[in-house]
């Protein structure tokens, strides 16, 4: 606790909160263009080929984003929409691509949690 004379000398410093997704620049989503689509292996103890894309954003940043769901249609020059949200077992991946928007197709034959994967309601 500072004394009165310490407060006279200099005011209290405001604590600045560090954002977990700086490339979004305080926006909920950001548009970008895929520069590279590839697979990456997760940290120990997990094992898989996670689908990720390097994306150049309208904010000027180039970030790595995760492609959720089974199967995707993304390739270089695809226009995608990004949201925040890291992938715990992929270091450096702090963004998710939103399925079912712009050039990203929704997950085919998805029946549960459809809204998260841009899948339309089944016909039957």
Swiss-Prot record:
GO molecular function terms listed in the Swiss-Prot or TrEMBL record: rRNA binding; structural constituent of ribosome; tRNA binding
Biological process terms in GO annotation: translation
Annotated Pfam families: Ribosom_S12_S23
Gene3D superfamilies found in the cross-reference section: Nucleic acid-binding proteins
Modified residues (3-methylthioaspartic acid): 89
GO cellular component, one term: small ribosomal subunit
Keyword field: Methylation, Ribonucleoprotein, Ribosomal protein, RNA-binding, rRNA-binding, tRNA-binding
Region described as Disordered: spans on this chain: 1-26, 104-124
Annotated function: With S4 and S5 plays an important role in translational accuracy.
Protein family according to the UniProt entry: Belongs to the universal ribosomal protein uS12 family.
HAMAP family to which the protein is assigned, alphabetical: Ribosomal_uS12_B (MF_00403_B)
Protein's name according to its UniProt entry: Small ribosomal subunit protein uS12
């Amino acid at each position: 606790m500072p004394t009165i004379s310490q407060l006279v000398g200099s005011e209290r410093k405001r604590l600045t909160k560090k954002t977990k997704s700086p490339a979004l620049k305080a926006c909920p989503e950001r548009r970008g263009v895929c520069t590279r689509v590839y697979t990456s292996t997760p940290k120990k103890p997990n094992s898989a080929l996670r689908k990720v894309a390097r994306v150049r954003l309208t904010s000027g940043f180039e970030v790595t984003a995760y492609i959720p769901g089974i199967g995707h249609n993304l390739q270089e020059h695809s226009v995608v929409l990004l949201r925040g949200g890291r992938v715990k077992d992929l270091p450096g991946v702090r963004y998710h691509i939103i399925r079912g928007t712009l050039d990203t197709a929704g997950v085919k034959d998805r029946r549960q949690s459809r809204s998260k994967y841009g899948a339309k309601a089944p016909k039957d």
